[in-house]
Amino acid sequence: MLTGQFLTPLMSGFVITVIFMPLFIGYLRFKKEGQTIRDEGPKWHAKKNGTPTMGGLVFIVAAVISSIWVAIWLQQLTNSLWIALFILVLYGLLGFSDDFIKVFKKQNLGLRAWQKLAGQILGGAVFLAVYFHEGFSHALNIPLIGTISSSWFFSLFVIVWLVGFSNAVNLADGIDGLVAGLAIVSFATYTIIAFRQNRIDVAIFGLTIIGGLIGFLIFNHKPAQIFMGDVGSLALGGALAAMSILLHREFSLLLIGLVYVIETASVMLQVASFKLFHKRIFKMSPIHHHFEMSGWSEWRIDISFWVFSIICSAIYLLIF
């Protein structure tokens, strides 16, 4: 892939996002529709009440359009790319439904947990159907254990992976700019892996998302003009999991996406500790809120988490 071909999907995702994001923000402000901040969060988040949300819709559309036209141009419109786009769109639609109920229907809890889970599992099932139809390998290389070649085990794993990481990224999306920056690092890492494997189709997918996220971050850094919403975070988590599966580097996500894992673990530990011992381990969970409650600025948390993610990704790329 030549330099111009490398820059094209990146710039396409970026330009489309930068052009249409201000229009989307303007529309939501005109309609006076924005995020309702829950009382359970840090008190100073109340000033963010009414901030436009669902910005993920714009960078998802940018990624889909860019991926398809660039893939056609480079003759890389493969089924791997289609199923990656399918997960991005379906999980984005789930998040959009959740956001729509919260923002336009004024029901702050959104979709019920079982509805969201059912949609995520359905998406995973369709992903698997196409995956197996194409004859892709269902051998799963588990570190320190070995290879398991069972279609049933692989299917269960894929469902858990897609559902787990879409929700993990969603949990991490709690302060301005955090997930956008983390996702840029994660997708960049998998794009490098895709180039190493000569998987140009998957690399195109990653590059268009990175471009869209860079464009989005212009409007999402503190003080955020717009949030990505569940439409963005659920889609990004599902897309990351899909890339790791398509590149047969599934467990790499535990290191490359270690921040998401820690965010999720902090919530689980907090809930378990409170239920069992009536004590809280953290001042607030997910853990980025713990640092907020400890006096860290959002910008300091962003930079610290981004740098940590870069280090984790660099370690993986250097070792593996």
Swiss-Prot record:
This is Phospho-N-acetylmuramoyl-pentapeptide-transferase. Its EC number is 2.7.8.13. The keyword Transferase applies. Keywords: Cell cycle, Cell division, Cell membrane, Cell shape, Cell wall biogenesis/degradation, Magnesium, Membrane, Metal-binding, Peptidoglycan synthesis, Transferase, Transmembrane, Transmembrane helix. Its cofactor is Mg(2+). It is found in: Cell membrane. The lineage of its organism: Bacteria, Bacillati, Bacillota, Bacilli, Lactobacillales. It is a multi-pass membrane protein. It is an enzyme of class 2 (transferase).
